[in-house]
Amino acid sequence: MNVVQGNIEAKNAKVAIVISRFNSFLVESLLEGALDTLKRFGQVSDENITVVRVPGAVELPLAARRVAASGKFDGIIALGAVIRGGTPHFDFVAGECNKGLAQIALEFDLPVAFGVLTTDTIEQAIERSGTKAGNKGGEAALSLLEMVNVLQQLEQQL
């Protein structure tokens, strides 16, 4: 039986982090978590990490698509925070952001890790950006590292 599964070390991986500025006090913590994970666990060097800042979560897919189209990266991490308010705006932003990022992964055959918080309250967002519910930026980086390795193995074996 042949089993393909990734590990989290990817020393030579070139990673782009596309991050929204909206809710910056939260997303900066997500960025710290992602960078720490990439460097400490993935052994990814600073020169192999590019950070792209965009205004908000709606702009993440377009920037990620441009990064993917460049062909210079092994994977993309998308970071942001969308918090439900009193209008349906949350549903549109969260849904379109998620759908757009998933489409890029499939279109370019490139791992795109979803580190965009979609929460009902500010408290939930704070919990997921480095306090008692962990750091979703770090978790997105772990997922990306593993998928970079899985895809490399599949390319070699198939």
Curated annotation (Swiss-Prot):
Tell me the keywords, alphabetical order. Riboflavin biosynthesis, Transferase
Any one of the GO CC terms: cytoplasm
Q: Name one GO molecular function term.
A: 6,7-dimethyl-8-ribityllumazine synthase activity
What does it catalyze?
(2S)-2-hydroxy-3-oxobutyl phosphate + 5-amino-6-(D-ribitylamino)uracil = 6,7-dimethyl-8-(1-D-ribityl)lumazine + phosphate + 2 H2O + H(+)
Per its UniProt record, what InterPro entries does this chain match?
A: LS (IPR034964), LS/RS (IPR002180), LS/RS_sf (IPR036467)
User: Which residues does the Swiss-Prot or TrEMBL record annotate as the active site?
Assistant: 89
Q: Where does 5-amino-6-(D-ribitylamino)uracil bind?
A: 22, 57-59, 81-83, 114
GO process terms (BP): riboflavin biosynthetic process
According to its UniProt record, this protein's enzyme class is transferase
Pathway where it operates: Cofactor biosynthesis; riboflavin biosynthesis; riboflavin from 2-hydroxy-3-oxobutyl phosphate and 5-amino-6-(D-ribitylamino)uracil: step 1/2
Q: Which SUPFAM superfamilies match?
A: Lumazine synthase
What's the EC number here? 2.5.1.78
* Residues bound to (2S)-2-hydroxy-3-oxobutyl phosphate: 86-87, 128
Q: What does this protein do?
A: Catalyzes the formation of 6,7-dimethyl-8-ribityllumazine by condensation of 5-amino-6-(D-ribitylamino)uracil with 3,4-dihydroxy-2-butanone 4-phosphate. This is the penultimate step in the biosynthesis of riboflavin.
Q: Which family does it belong to?
A: Belongs to the DMRL synthase family.
* Quaternary structure and partners: Forms an icosahedral capsid composed of 60 subunits, arranged as a dodecamer of pentamers.
Among PANTHER family, the record links this protein to: 6,7-DIMETHYL-8-RIBITYLLUMAZINE SYNTHASE (PTHR21058:SF0), 6,7-DIMETHYL-8-RIBITYLLUMAZINE SYNTHASE DMRL SYNTHASE LUMAZINE SYNTHASE (PTHR21058)
Q: What is this protein called?
A: 6,7-dimethyl-8-ribityllumazine synthase
